[in-house]
């Protein structure tokens, strides 16, 4: 997310990091680097050469120009995250669009997640240039676009992760209802709703974003109505609650209830295979929750601390700030791995994409026929339906080491 687009929150980390400012090596005490160009009117800790990209801390160095090592480290970090994130997410989207058997409700959510994550990581080159030059050279239009993309995709990515958690909870805990609810059509409608909800912050931020000429440099920043401190802090609080606290609670509760349900199914079936499947899915759940928390917690805590106390501008502070931002974006790189590349069906399609053969083409045609027959499932008792949903869930999650 655009570093200045971050209100002290972290798309980003959807993410938060996405909305944080990358403008300065270290954000001003109350600013959000990528997640919210909240600091349109922050003090200028960097001096005349500082650029406040709104909510993201300015990209300017703590004192004078950044050292060569610091600049190279930050640019390398951003470059790796950008390349890996774009490649992984575009590959996920291509495979889902290319292969008919991948057009399931779950994969439609994954497509939406990959789209949001790809757009989020696409803003990193702008943040890198802003950091190196100490000014925003891209004009007002791109300023508005980059900042709004940060917010839009941070929230869309996180909302989609929550949606997938609820979707899997319904599949396991309410298998009968899942037959009607977990359809590709409903998944598309929910994805559209997630983008509309993200507009609640994305559109206002787009109108608030602007460029300002100050001390020989141009800032891409957010402007707030008076009282400035009130609206700035309100944005930070909203981002923190809706982009971090609530998603963590929703994801944790849904997966926790799912594990409890799977345990009860295992006890009823008495199957050792179900026991192994439960352990496998439990590990997957723990990894998903842990990755989200690890990627987004640092930037949120950092922003809160900077809003409460003044942190001296040092090289370490600059690097750590941008590291937190990159960590939030890293979540966008890991999502394809967690939700797609570990899926056996996805890996099979990827192999077919890399090494197409006539047998693969024939297999794809036969898969279309089998999928059509699965659109009319037979009835069964609740335990059998739950076991069936568990088997489907296993197909969507690859075994973790």
Swiss-Prot record:
Glycosylation sites: 9, 12, 34, 41, 49
Extracellular side, ranges: 1-69, 133-143, 209-231, 308-315
PTM characteristics: Phosphorylated. Differentially phosphorylated in basal and agonist-induced conditions. Agonist-mediated phosphorylation modulates receptor internalization. Phosphorylated by GRK2 in a agonist-dependent manner. Phosphorylation at Tyr-169 requires receptor activation, is dependent on non-receptor protein tyrosine kinase Src and results in a decrease in agonist efficacy by reducing G-protein coupling efficiency. Phosphorylated on tyrosine residues; the phosphorylation is involved in agonist-induced G-protein-independent receptor down-regulation.
Source organism superkingdom: Eukaryota
Entry keyword annotation includes Magnesium: no
InterPro entries per the UniProt record, alphabetical: GPCR_Rhodpsn, GPCR_Rhodpsn_7TM, Mu_opioid_rcpt, Opioid_rcpt
GO cellular component, one term: neuron projection
Membrane topology note: Multi-pass membrane protein
Record Pfam families: 7tm_1
Chain segments annotated as transmembrane: 70-94, 108-132, 144-166, 187-208, 232-256, 281-307, 316-339
Motif (NPxxY): 335-339
Gene Ontology biological process terms, A to Z: adenylate cyclase-inhibiting G protein-coupled acetylcholine receptor signaling pathway; adenylate cyclase-inhibiting G protein-coupled receptor signaling pathway; G protein-coupled opioid receptor signaling pathway; negative regulation of cytosolic calcium ion concentration; negative regulation of nitric oxide biosynthetic process; negative regulation of Wnt protein secretion; neuropeptide signaling pathway; phospholipase C-activating G protein-coupled receptor signaling pathway
Assembly description: Forms homooligomers and heterooligomers with other GPCRs, such as OPRD1, OPRK1, OPRL1, NPFFR2, ADRA2A, SSTR2, CNR1 and CCR5 (probably in dimeric forms). Interacts with heterotrimeric G proteins; interaction with a heterotrimeric complex containing GNAI1, GNB1 and GNG2 stabilizes the active conformation of the receptor and increases its affinity for endomorphin-2, the synthetic opioid peptide DAMGO and for morphinan agonists. Interacts with PPL; the interaction disrupts agonist-mediated G-protein activation. Interacts (via C-terminus) with DNAJB4 (via C-terminus).
Protein name stated in the entry: Mu-type opioid receptor
Source organism: Pan troglodytes
Classification lineage: Eukaryota, Metazoa, Chordata, Craniata, Vertebrata
